[in-house]
């Protein structure tokens, strides 16, 4: 019976879309489409096993993702935003990235920056230290940063950056 932020924006005439990890249920009414999102592209399970070309969901139908999932989620969100702007419709886009998170997979262009790099961070317990895992997590953060930058650039290109509120937070 809870009213979500997406329900509120939708009721106010906004286009609503979610692109990425949804960890709140996959069955209606807990599915994103049952929580105020007209457009949903992502995965609703608690964990995903492969981040390249994964099986994802688009409004209830299983589809094959395209490339690295975080890049794909960003692409779909930018398409949604562009379509909303073309229709002169305000939009609420929710883009919950799933990385950095296992499995520690990231596109080579981001991995290469950290592969073999000396790390200044160290685990307090040397027995628990996993340098390759840390490098992969840093590469994933670099990818998230790149994707957020692409999204902000898209907002500027569409001429809506000064009239758009962007909130960024992350739980990993």
Annotate each predicted stretch with a short phrase.
Residues 1-172:
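Formylglycine-dependent sulfatase
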């Amino acid at each position: 019976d809870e009213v979500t932020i997406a329900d509120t924006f939708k009721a106010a005439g906004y286009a609503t879309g979610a692109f990425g990890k949804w960890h709140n249920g996959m069955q209606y009414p807990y599915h994103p489409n049952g929580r105020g999102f007209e457009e949903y592209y992502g995965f609703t399970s608690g964990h995903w096993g492969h981040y390249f070309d994964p099986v994802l969901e688009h409004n209830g139908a299983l589809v094959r993702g395209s490339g690295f999932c975080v890049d794909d989620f960003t692409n779909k969100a930018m398409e949604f935003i562009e379509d909303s702007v073309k229709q002169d419709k305000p939009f609420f886009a929710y883009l919950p990235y799933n990385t950095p998170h296992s499995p520690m997979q990231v596109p080579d262009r981001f991995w290469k920056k950290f592969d073999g790099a000396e790390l200044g961070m160290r685990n307090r317990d040397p027995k628990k230290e996993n340098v390759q895992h840390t490098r992969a997590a840093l590469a994933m953060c670099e990818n998230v940063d790149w994707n957020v930058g692409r999204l902000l650039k898209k907002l500027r290109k569409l001429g809506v950056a000064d009239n758009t509120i962007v909130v960024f937070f992350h739980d990993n």
